[in-house]
Amino acid sequence: MDSFIAIDYETANSNYLSACALGITFVERGVVLESVQTYIKPPEEFSTFDPFNITIHKIQPSQVKNAPSFDTVWEVIEKFHSKNNVPFACHYSGFDIRVTEALLKYYNIKYQEIEFYDTFTIAKKMWPEFSNHKLNYLAQKFDIELDHHNASSDAQACALIALKQIEVLEKKSLSEVAQNYGFKLGILNSSGIKTMSNS
């Protein structure tokens, strides 16, 4: 079965560069190896915390004051990604992949091309009868423990939903699940983002 990295960001405000926490779940051959959350210190010019965001994720400015910057955090992800050449999984890649792109550009980080899979997009195709396809709704449906907007918990829930999607279709990889619905995995590289599409 597939190996991949599930990610989830929380941001201090509406700017993608204000990422203040990152949840990472490493999956190898269908087994969750580890789920971690790391706080991220946003660049100074994007570090103002919006009270609305705080009410969602409960992260305070004091908690990221001495946190590593994204370029340091990225080294951990890149080590696993480059070693295994694995795709990323996100629940609504329109946010998480755009945050990743913005931060990679800001810190001028060179990186291998990243393929990505959107559990939200596939959930809409796989379970059209569900009233919605939000992460917390799917977690409840599949008895997945979730502390919503805790980045580590969100990333792990995303990983488990991705594995559920593989299991339902009896496939071996995220790419095969996507192909089942006529999609190709999305791509993030130095030229920009190519969304997961069926075109």
Annotate each language-model stretch with its function.
Residues I161-S199:
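Acidic two-metal-ion nuclease catalytic site recognized across multiple nuclease folds
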Residues L103-Y106, K125, K141, I161-V168:
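Active-site catalytic microenvironments for nucleophilic, acid-base chemistry
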Residues Y117-N132:
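Short alpha-helix plus adjacent loop in nuclease-associated cores
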Residues P128, D147-S152:
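Active-site metal-coordination segments of metallo-dependent hydrolases
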Residues M1-L103, E113, L135, Q140, ...:
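Conserved non-catalytic scaffold segment of RNase H-like nuclease domains
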Residues N150-K164:
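Acidic, divalent-metal-coordinating active-site segment for phosphoryl/phosphodiester hydrolysis
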Residues Y111-Y117:
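Short hydrophobic/aromatic-enriched beta-strand-loop microsegments
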Residues T11-N13, T121, A157:
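Short, glycine/acidic-enriched loop or turn micro-motifs at the edges of active sites
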